[in-house]
């Protein structure tokens, strides 16, 4: 990790924050040139660099201390290691470079000589955290490293894709299908008006392509990329222009299946392996990387420890609701002694061909891994229990922390993340890393490590054991607040404000199809014309994913005067897996915050709407790698105004996942709405443009200064809790089967993709 810090350091730092206006900013030529460089430098990052301009730049690398705003011993050691060939093959240094020229040169050098995983890690951190890089973006992590998000079968097919071979294959495939699918319905039994075809009789959920008669190989995409907001792009003349002459190919992609052992948990693989869901966790840990100190990077202004731990709670709440949709119930408790009933096979492959390790059913945690780590992690939880119970902690430098104050959750959060702002950096800083290494049966003393999902942020949430272990982490959060006095009636009451009613529109989830850009997996020859790269082919992974129809709230709030207020919205379960009502005291741990927004009430009755698309922390589908690169090139030619908000901010949670799967007949859930006074001196998003920036280190990311999860952060006294400015609303979440029609009616174009699947 020290290498990553150094690589981050050598790539650059500038310390001035900028204030943006609310108008859409258009990139200038200088910005576009920088953006072009970033897109090209990570193109096929596992292959040798093929752009001559950047190769020459990388070869011009020099190591001069004057080029950096801050220079430390790790940077010096890195260069010494490089001279003697002792660095990881390819990977590490970027944040403290004085200017773009130094940064660019160092990045080109690192791309050629450093480990590709370390390179992308450090480059991502630099782009996210440098103040002078606001607006610059990298492709999404699942576009840079698709193999961390899609199964090995798909990855192998993408890596061996060859257009000439594909063209011949498709010719024979067509002749084959013309015979195979001719009058196919007459050969199979029509029973109760349902069509059960040979190619769909072994259909499993989410294997949509079998219902259309497709195979798991490449198909030409002659229309458009599939996604939520595709209509916006398909009607854009500039969009159609940039894709003229570009060949697109898609392949159906499955989620993890039971291959070697039965495992009911794989029924949730569509959720735990969701690309956007896993990317969210990755970027959270990039935004608040454990080794970045809060003072230098301004992260302490964002309550980084509390925010990280609250996100753990949010993700667990969301996962629990998805489990309830399938009748699974509580997340199993993690134990270092008892065996883990359900195993997991990620079916992923590293870029060098080595497969990711898997865990069998009834896995015994204590029987594997390095026992030094085992005892360190056990000791850590014992110490946390001790200091929280005691209520006072004295740091190694003599500072006393009162753990009965609610704001002390910031310290607890930093300890649980193991970041460098911890109270006792020597003991607490490494426990989190040791825990992941132990669960991945890794060893710091070995030079070669087998890939394991617990060793990468972008893969760890795929495993059901992740939620079991992080439930143990979240238990420390709740243990801390168990010692904080519950809110009193007076503290919760907002005099003069009453929520009279909230109407919720119909809540409907469904599965749709989406294309992910996986062009980085291609191995064919790159095309250059006059030294300029021509992006003429794009590979797409077409996958089914959970989504929901847009919904809205109709608020009716009465106020005795005009005033600014904060309105919070939470979603939580109503019943457990056995149909029993969950008491509010227990259920507070299961509510997930969906939205909080500022609103100015007038005196009297206020009626207004809030739409799901406006939730403050969610994002729509991001613009793809191919599209971004082509837009940049068009803008450099002066034919397009490149807006800085062309893609969604990296830190947003996928909008389509805010609702759990639900049931066909309606799954009972409940919304909780809460209105509080707006008393914060600052205005949210006031120092940055939230349409493209995450505002890290700004101190104004959040709507106010109350504890995250308020008022569900503390234990609930039901005699004190209920006030007129709160409102509970019982709802049902319905699930519609988008693909049911394929069983109900004959599909006339069997063997061809159905673009009307969602109608």
Curated annotation (Swiss-Prot):
It holds the Pfam family Hemocyanin_M. One of its GO terms (molecular function) is nutrient reservoir activity. It comes from the Eukaryota. Its main location: secreted. It is found in: Secreted, Extracellular space. SUPFAM superfamilies: Di-copper centre-containing domain, E set domains, Hemocyanin, N-terminal domain. Heterohexamer. PANTHER family: FAT-BODY PROTEIN 1-RELATED, LARVAL STORAGE PROTEIN/PHENOLOXIDASE. This is Arylphorin subunit C223. It comes from Calliphora vicina (Blue blowfly).
């Amino acid at each position: 990790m020290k290498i990553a810090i150094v690589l981050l350091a050598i790539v650059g730092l500038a310390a001035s924050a900028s204030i943006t206006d609310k108008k859409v900013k258009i990139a200038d030529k200088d910005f576009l040139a920088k953006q072009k460089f970033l897109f090209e430098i990570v193109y096929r990052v596992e292959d040798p660099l093929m752009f001559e301009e950047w190769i020459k730049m990388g070869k011009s690398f020099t190591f001069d201390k004057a080029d950096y705003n801050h220079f430390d011993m790790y940077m010096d050691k890195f260069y010494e290691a490089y001279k003697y060939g002792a660095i990881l093959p390819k990977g590490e240094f970027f944040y403290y470079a004085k200017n773009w020229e130094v940064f660019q040169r160092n990045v080109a050098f690192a791309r050629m000589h450093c480990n590709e995983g370390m390179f992308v890690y450090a480059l991502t951190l630099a782009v996210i955290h440098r103040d002078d890089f606001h607006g610059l973006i990298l492709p999404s992590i699942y576009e840079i490293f698709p193999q961390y998000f899609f199964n090995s079968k798909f990855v192998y097919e993408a890596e061996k894709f060859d257009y000439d071979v594909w063209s011949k294959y498709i010719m024979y495939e067509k002749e084959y299908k013309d015979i195979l699918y001719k009058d196919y319905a007459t050969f199979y039994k029509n029973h109760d008006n349902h069509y059960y075809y040979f190619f769909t009789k072994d259909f499993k959920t989410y294997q949509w392509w079998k219902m259309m008669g497709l195979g798991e190989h490449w198909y030409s995409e002659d229309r458009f990329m599939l996604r939520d907001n595709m209509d916006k792009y398909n009607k854009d003349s500039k969009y159609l222009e940039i894709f003229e002459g570009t060949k697109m190919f898609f392949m159906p992609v499955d989620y993890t299946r039971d291959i070697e052992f039965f495992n009911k948990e794989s029924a949730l693989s569509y959720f735990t392996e969701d690309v956007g869901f896993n990317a969210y966790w990755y970027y959270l840990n990039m935004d608040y990387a454990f080794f970045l100190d809060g003072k230098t990077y301004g992260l302490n202004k964002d309550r980084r420890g509390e925010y990280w731990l609250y996100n753990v709670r949010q993700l667990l709440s969301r996962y629990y609701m998805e489990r309830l949709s399938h009748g699974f119930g509580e997340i199993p408790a993690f134990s270092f002694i008892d065996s883990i009933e359900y195993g997991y096979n990620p079916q992923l492959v590293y870029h060098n061909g080595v497969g990711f390790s898997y865990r069998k059913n009834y896995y015994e945690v204590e029987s594997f891994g390095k026992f030094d780590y085992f005892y360190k992690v056990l000791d850590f939880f014992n110490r946390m229990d001790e200091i929280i119970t005691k209520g006072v902690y004295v740091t190694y430098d003599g500072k006393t922390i009162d753990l009965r104050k609610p704001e002390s959750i910031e310290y607890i959060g930093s300890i649980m993340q193991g970041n460098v702002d911890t109270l006792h950096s020597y003991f607490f800083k490494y426990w989190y890393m040791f825990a992941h290494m132990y669960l991945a049966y890794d060893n710091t003393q070995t030079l070669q490590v087998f890939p394991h999902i617990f060793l990468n942020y972008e893969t760890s949430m795929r495993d059901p054991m992740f939620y079991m272990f992080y439930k143990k982490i979240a238990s420390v959060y709740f243990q801390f607040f168990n010692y904080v006095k519950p809110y009193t009636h007076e503290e919760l009451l907002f005099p003069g404000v009453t929520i009279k009613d909230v109407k919720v529109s119909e809540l409907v989830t469904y599965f749709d199809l989406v294309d992910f850009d996986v062009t980085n997996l291609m191995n064919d020859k790159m095309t250059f014309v006059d030294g300029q790269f021509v992006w003429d082919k794009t590979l797409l992974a077409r996958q089914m994913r959970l989504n929901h129809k847009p919904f809205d709230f109709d608020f009716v709030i009465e106020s005795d005067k005009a005033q600014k207020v904060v309105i919070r919205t939470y979603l939580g379960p109503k019943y457990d897996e056995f149909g029993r009502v969950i008491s509010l005291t227990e259920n507070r741990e299961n509510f997930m915050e969906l939205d909080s927004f500022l609103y100015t009430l007038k005196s009297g009755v206020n009626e207004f709407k809030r739409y799901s698309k406006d939730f403050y922390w969610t994002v729509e589908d991001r613009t793809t790698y191919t599209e971004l690169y082509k837009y940049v090139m068009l803008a450099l030619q002066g034919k397009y105004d490149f807006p800085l908000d062309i893609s969604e901010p990296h830190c947003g949670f996928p909008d389509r996942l805010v609702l759990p799967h639900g049931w066909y007949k309606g799954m009972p859930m409940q919304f909780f709405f809460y209105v509080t006074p707006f008393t914060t001196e600052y205005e949210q998003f006031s120092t940055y443009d939230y349409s493209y920036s995450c505002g890290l280190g700004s101190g104004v990311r959040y709507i106010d200064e109350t504890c995250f999860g308020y008022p569900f952060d503390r234990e609930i006294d039901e005699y004190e809790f209920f006030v007129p400015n709160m409102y509970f609303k019982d709802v049902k979440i319905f699930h519609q089967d988008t693909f049911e029609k394929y069983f109900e009616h004959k599909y006339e174009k069997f063997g061809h993709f159905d673009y009307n699947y969602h109608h």
